[in-house]
Curated annotation (Swiss-Prot):
Pfam families associated with the record: Herpes_U5
Family: Belongs to the herpesviridae U4 family.
Keywords: G0/G1 host cell cycle checkpoint dysregulation by virus, Host nucleus, Host-virus interaction, Modulation of host cell cycle by virus
Biological function: Promotes a cell cycle arrest in G0/G1 by inducing the proteasomal degradation of host histone acetyltransferase KAT5/Tip60.
Gene: UL27
UniProt subcellular location: Host nucleus; Host nucleus, Host nucleolus
Biased composition (Basic and acidic residues): 18-33
Name used for this protein in its record: Protein UL27
Native source organism of the sequence: Human cytomegalovirus (strain Merlin)
Main location: host cell
Stretches for region Disordered: 1-33
InterPro entries in the cross-refs: UL27-like_protein_herpesevirus
Amino acid sequence: MNPVDQPPPPPLTQQPEEQAKEDHDDGDERLFRDPLTTYEYLDDCRDDEEFCHQFLRAYLTPIRNRQEAVRAGLLCRTPEDLAAAGGQKRKTPAPKHPKHAMVYIRRSCLVHSACATAHGKYDIRGLTLESDLAVWAALRGVPLPPDPQHFRWLNAGAFRRLVHEAQYLPEISRAAKRIALAVATGQYVVCTLLDYKTFGTRTHYLRQLCSMTEELYLRLDGTLCLFLEPEERELIGRCLPAALCRGLPVKYRTHRAAVFFHATFMARAEAALKDLYAAFCECGDGRDDGGNHNGNYGGGDHSSLSPSAVASHHSRLEHAELRLERNRHLGAFHLPAIRHLTAGDVARVQDSVSRDLGFADWSQTLVDDYFLLPAGWACANPRRGYAMYLASNAVLALRIIRLLRASIRHEYTACIRMLSGDVQRLIRLFKGEAALLRKGLAQNPVQRRELSRFRKHVHDLKRIRFTEDTFVETFCDFLELVQRIPDYRSVSLRIKRELLCLHVFKLRRGCRAPPTPEAVRVQRLLWHSLRHGDAPQDRTRLPQFSSALSDAELSNHANRCRRKAPLELGPAVVAAPGPSVRYRAHIQKFERLHVRRFRPHEVGGHAT
């Protein structure tokens, strides 16, 4: 066939999600550019700060009657209006009036906008609206349920890089940028490490792992009544915490889950599990090729092993050298020798642990005692299989507990070191400013006051010393100190709230974020915060967090913490993360109706 005669290729079809995103973006663009977009304002709460009233006066014009609607272009003049004005009726029928969008603005959303930004919620000032929302979502989105395929732990270095590379307002000084970076780092520590009672934090996950491991050992202790042979009961007893703590400076009855952090406890638990495999396993997979605990246990002859067990020797769980993603600076680690796993189970466990230490998989379960190992081992009788399953889960949980504790300690010390460096950097900046004024001889009273102010800032900053034991108290003192620095104090929260409300309610576009999954997540979280409200994490609320990351706190010994549910946004927010929009061709009531109040520099009414 001649290429000219070939039929044209069929048009490329788009996926439903991509098509929905494009339709949503086109709809938003029409709302921003249509000068006849109307707004209905709903009074559903009090306005104590007068922000809502001033926002309406600045950016919206009320429509009180039909004449004002005609002047605004929302309605055409009717034949009755023409007759009353002395005109003649139109003989031809009037053209069909197009439909225009009506956006619903709730006063509660305007009030809640105070804590829907990093400036209002966390006192991180000076960022542009787009960067502000990105930093705010990184901290506020910690309690969200993780995506098992894409979730990774956020470390302090990556978060500081996000804040450091963000876009700042042009009038922000170098000192204000450094203060914003330090405040963001302190809020990161509180949101990810010191908030024990919120889903998504590492410390909450560590407490739940400790509670789960205690439950596993309690159930393993309960299996002793199922065995009559003294040798079998002794093997199970060696796997229990009371025997593993023998000779150690910590006791399980006194310190409870804090003993799980001890290295010797972990090594003894792994050795006891090997002995349990050697005695209870009947399929041959329990024989380890790296040790000899029971005569011929772990020898090089695999003739007695099943074919599946021989194949599994090439992909043992403990053979792979793993590194925690986004925390590779913690070094390589190996998982314990867990048996009776298929090649798929081994790959799944290794991937889950190296990705996020099993957090995403754990968060998807509804049963607290379930972890990463598959249930239903058929290598022995049900009694022995159940005992091996409980002991294996406990040993795997112990290894992850120690890895998680190490990552928490590393994050905490790294953040304290970074904050101390920020304070020293601020001291050098203010000393430099004071030196410039001093070299200029401070010739007038204004310069002399500035010189005195810089010297006072240096004196106050020298008293800020971040330590592990007094982090929260020192951070509160730092927040109080920066409120006395004009470069940081003068950044307006009202302007940031106005920009946010203008963008959310389709009055003026404040940022042009690409339609990525992360942008959709930020939009949903933002609309949830505007609908339900939030509280600022300021100096009045921070003292409720504890600075002590002791073993008793991390293991939940002093204050037992139940498993918390993640932050659910709700189906309404997920389906429509934005204000309600309706299209109407006929306007019957003018109550609560508004249109844009365009500024003189906005030509043609295109608020872009």
